[in-house]
A protein has these predicted regions:
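Alpha-helical scaffolding within the catalytic cores
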Residues: 33-37, 59-62, 88-93, 148-149, ...
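H/E-rich (His + Asp/Glu) clusters that bind or coordinate divalent metals
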Residues: 172-219
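Catalytic metal-binding/acid-base residues of hydrolase active sites
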Residues: 8, 55, 169, 201-202
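A generic "structured core" feature
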Residues: 1-10, 14, 42, 123-124, ...
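Active-site gating/metal-coordination segments in enzymes
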Residues: 59-146, 153-155, 190, 195-204, ...
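Non-membrane alpha-helical structural segments and their capping/turn regions in soluble enzymes
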Residues: 27, 31, 89, 122-126, ...
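An N-terminally biased module of ancient metal coordination in phosphate/nucleic-acid-related enzymes
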Residues: 1-68
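Short hydrophobic/aromatic-enriched beta-strand-loop microsegments
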Residues: 75-79, 162-167
């Protein structure tokens, strides 16, 4: 069985997707449902998918859990927690009675949108992420280069939590800029409790003029 580890679905009539900013994203500023996804992956050899939160909104995760419970295409859900909040684990507990809770496999916060580049090394973040590990949940790291130092420190502080680095931390592919990303990713790779999703590369390249050779140095 082949499971794709990262897909998003959304309904713009239910909530806005605040990250869809600028003309470049106009082609995807439309609803994208699980059936749209099913059609898109036809013939790709993908049997199931993990759906991942898209917004910092506690209402979205219950919807994704219900989707997982009702559609066999969904193998798991990565839900949302504001991971630096004192009540983050209480919010996690609030998911437990919900339909589809058994499909919750991980948690993500959109850390790269926060101005504080040390966000992921906050003591409360460390505490909450350690608790995720005790509960058998993965923490998805959504970072860019400025946030990687804190991400590395978090992974080191939580040896019993498994981490997934999303989108190889969004290096500056369009600028062919390897540093400090290359040193950071090498250090992160030395830690046994983290893996990486090779995803989201095209969005960091020159959208109109990219070629496959642009990506080789980052892989």
């Amino acid at each position: 069985m082949r499971i794709d580890s990262h897909h998003h679905v959304w309904d713009l009539s239910v909530r806005e997707q605040g990250w869809m900013v600028g003309e470049a994203l106009n082609p995807i500023k439309k609803n994208f449902s699980i059936n749209d996804l099913r059609q898109a992956i036809t013939g790709c050899g993908i049997d199931k998918t993990v759906v991942v939160q898209t917004v910092t909104n506690y209402d979205e995760t219950p919807e994704l859990l219900e989707l997982a419970d009702t559609d066999d295409l969904v193998a798991g859900v990565v839900g949302f927690l504001k991971i630096d909040a004192d009540d983050a684990i209480a919010h996690l507990d609030s998911y437990q009675p919900l339909r589809g809770f058994k499909y919750l496999v991980g948690i993500r916060d959109i850390a790269h949108d926060y101005e504080d580049v040390k966000y992921l090394s906050k003591p409360q973040v460390v505490k909450n992420v350690q608790e995720l590990g005790r509960r058998g949940l993965v923490y998805d790291l959504l970072t860019k280069t400025p946030h990687m130092r804190a991400a590395i420190d978090l992974v080191k502080a939580c040896p019993n939590t498994k981490f997934v680095l999303d989108h190889i931390s969004k290096p500056y592919i369009a600028k062919a800029d390897m540093q400090p990303w290359a040193d950071q990713i090498t250090e992160l790779a030395s830690l046994e409790n983290v893996v990486v999703k090779v995803s989201g590369l095209f969005t960091e390249a020159d959208w109109k003029n990219w070629k496959k050779e642009d990506f080789w140095p980052y892989l």
